[in-house]
């Protein structure tokens, strides 16, 4: 065909001529391509056409010309195949493949796709050359060529079933390629190729992934997709469950009348499977038998020997892995290898099941249960070993272990083949309720085997013994077993029933598992009424009625008539020992809370009680009537006016005089001021009303308060009787409340409780002040509420001669002491703050009051008007805390009685020098003991000095540390003048803590105990004496960091060291601690590859691992200090910022991974502290500080900072 030849020659000439227009070339190419598509290509035109195509594909000036060349080549190959003249293709294959290899890595996607298609077309014609080209492309350096070649392999495998085994090794190698695109393509190509591959190929793939050290994320992705595909296929191919096999009906008429569904309901409930696991476990699929054998071989070492801290976790993980394998395909596809592997690990599995770790033991028991349910008869050879183990476990004292053993035994019996040894093990077990369920399981699952093997007599003996057992729980369990036995062998059950006693028969008939229970109950109801009177239930009811009647008669006989004018008539029943006194006294005070203009004649009278009841809020109150004990023994009756809670003297033989004097004049009275109606609710209405919620005062939370103790207040509060005229010699005895004066307050503080009527006088009990005085003593107290502007002064109260004093009581000493008169904040309610100590005003003694002055009777100081001048009224909570153990509290000051101003040294008064210690909240405790020179204090000081010497000489024992800890927590003044021993003890403990273990000449266990005690002593001083230890915080922090080098991170003392460092960071001086830690870590020798071996360091004695632990903890501490500096608004100086940045850059090159990890966290904290806002990167102080870091380290920092920002 001359036309095609002419066109081909013209095209070849145009392609070879550079000056030919591109459009002309394309036109000529289109003509040739059209002739190829529609006409036969003569042999003389084939070689020139190949040359034209080669020139066009290799052209670089026109992409359109290249695409036309690929299109023409595709049509040309198809035409030659139709003409069956492919020899020219094989002859030109070498040139063509070289050209296509170049185009596989072309920048244009269209060119790569065209070359990929051409290779697919050429593969049937010259497969060797094409596969060689693909191998070269996958091994080459061009990333695009690698992507295209792997895509070609996947395409050819899916369309042409191309074997890919020859390419798998290179694809796995490409999983670790430097180019991320190549890794991603290789990952998806491996998944696509191996999804339909056989299981042994997948197993080999996993081994190659491990051997080539493929990164974990890619390997996990591939494994998960392959396992997911296998799981999905298994679920799709799973056959439907077989229909349930119905058991044959019972042969006899008696068995046909029984109802098993209703008669053994409790047994069915007991056999429900254990609850589903909280943690879902995915099955593990095994692809080859060799892989399964390798897994069992790797599991063996942790199961050997005894359980220890080093192998228990591996045992638990292996047990969980076995359960996952059991859920997979291994038991079905490789049963022989699986059973053999389980047998080799059986001893270790039983060790796991018998461990004392509850979760681990449960895991082992569940594994055995699942083995029994899955392998069933395959575990018959191990049945005796398993039963011996788990029957023994059923006797464990731990309930969870016993239940696990019971469930496991039932699972084993239910699923294995029966033999006589199983029945013997069950019969040999101790008689208990669990054995009853095992017998039921044997009857249900193996009834035919038991009957034919001669085990029926043994079963009968077990059930008869259980039904007649002495334990009621065992009898109850075996009744259900009996009726299960009766379902299968009714004749034997009836024969056994006839041999039982009447009690056992009755219990069996009434058992809920009895199918004929309704018939038995109807028969029993038809019995004569005689059984109702003589039966056990009727006898118990009659006995109960008789006891109740006797109780009512006793209560009626023991009733005591009400005592008029009784002091106990208004007392509520005692609720507890701690509130006994308070409840009685509040009831007495409540009777005086009347709204009338004047008080009633007597505070203890019944009329006053009734008036208080009328003012009570709501019905149902505790004061809704006269309250007395329901049963009062006659021998405890007291006189009508006795106060059961009054204070009595020991030894004087006198009784408390009447609250209402017998000689009180009826007409002559002293004029007194009338108290107006109170604007607040009376105490009786809030103390005894159940409808009032106890609302705490806000002053306890938000304001600085001075807490007043009102112990025993209003316990014997009585209304003042009308006093006689001035000329009448009247002997008046009044039971007086225990009242403290209110100390003077600074303008910035308010009293905790402004009592009603504190501007009036009060009467004091002479017994409280002077224990040896007569009973006719009356004390007049002047105005208690003083103006805040009054100056502070101290005048000791006038007291009597010591000859009048008996043994001092705490309350008497409180009133005599100027300290207790002015500062009573250590008692009763406590606040976290305290106003400066002041002295109480003068108190004139009324011992020698002139007879013509008359008796002054004043209003109840607790029920009067509230002072109008008080702006912040603080009410005491109705059901708040009660001041108990006053005597003990008086000797021991409170831990929270000093304000925060005292901690900072801003106290308004110069306190005497005394022992002081700080609590964990920073408040200071002062103990102003007058016995600083007593023997105990001197002894403790000598012991402290001896302890310090022993610590310095490294001969101290642990009991000495504990003794010093007790002295530190005590209130004794053990530190001496200017607290010189305090610093000596702290520094000695710090030096002892830093000493290496090798330098202490004792055993390592004892050294560890000594270090722990030394650290406990240091922590006690830090927490209790925070003000004194403030200057040592940086020193202690450095010691803690250096000591950390001696201990592993998992040791207990390491945890205590970290806790101590956290407390110092939280409460210490941030700037000082920051500088100290910086100096410490800067002195550490660098562990970078470029570090000099002669680097300067003060810690050169530290080993490599110890130095790493110190550096890691120091970096974490620096990060915490930087964070807390931001919280405290502490500015980092430029010098500190520069040093921190240099440290960060230095630690980036550290050889230890833990140090680098801690350094990253430290850099993140530093960035959050000093980084500039977004958009001001040029002013960012963080990047300037770390400017010396290498580029890869800066990139790593940027990654973690972006990750933190995204989180």
Curated annotation (Swiss-Prot):
Q: Where is the composition biased (Low complexity)?
A: 576-594, 711-724, 791-806
Which ranges are annotated Polar residues under compositional bias? 605-624, 653-672, 684-710, 895-905, 919-928
Renumbered to this chain, the Basic and acidic residues biased-composition regions fall at 869-878
Q: Name one GO molecular function term.
A: microtubule binding
Q: Which UniProt keywords apply?
A: Cell cycle, Cell division, Cytoplasm, Cytoskeleton, Microtubule, Mitosis, Nucleus, Repeat
Q: Where in the cell is it found?
A: Cytoplasm, Cytoskeleton; Nucleus; Cytoplasm, Cytoskeleton, Spindle
Q: Where is this region: Disordered?
A: 504-525, 549-730, 789-856, 869-928, 1086-1105
Signal peptide bounds: none
Its GO CC terms are:
cytoplasmic microtubule; microtubule organizing center; mitotic spindle; mitotic spindle midzone; nucleus; spindle microtubule
* Biological process per Gene Ontology, one example term: mitotic spindle assembly
Pfam families in the cross-refs = CLASP_N
Keyword Amino-acid biosynthesis: yes or no? no
Q: How does it assemble?
A: Interacts with microtubules.
* Chain's role: Microtubule binding protein that promotes the stabilization of dynamic microtubules. Required for mitotic spindle formation.
Which PANTHER family does its entry note? CLASP (PTHR21567), CLIP-ASSOCIATING PROTEIN (PTHR21567:SF9)
Give the family from UniProt.
Answer: Belongs to the CLASP family.
Which protein are we looking at?
Protein STU1
Q: From which lineage does this chain's organism come?
A: Eukaryota, Fungi, Dikarya, Ascomycota, Pezizomycotina
Q: Name the gene behind this protein.
A: STU1
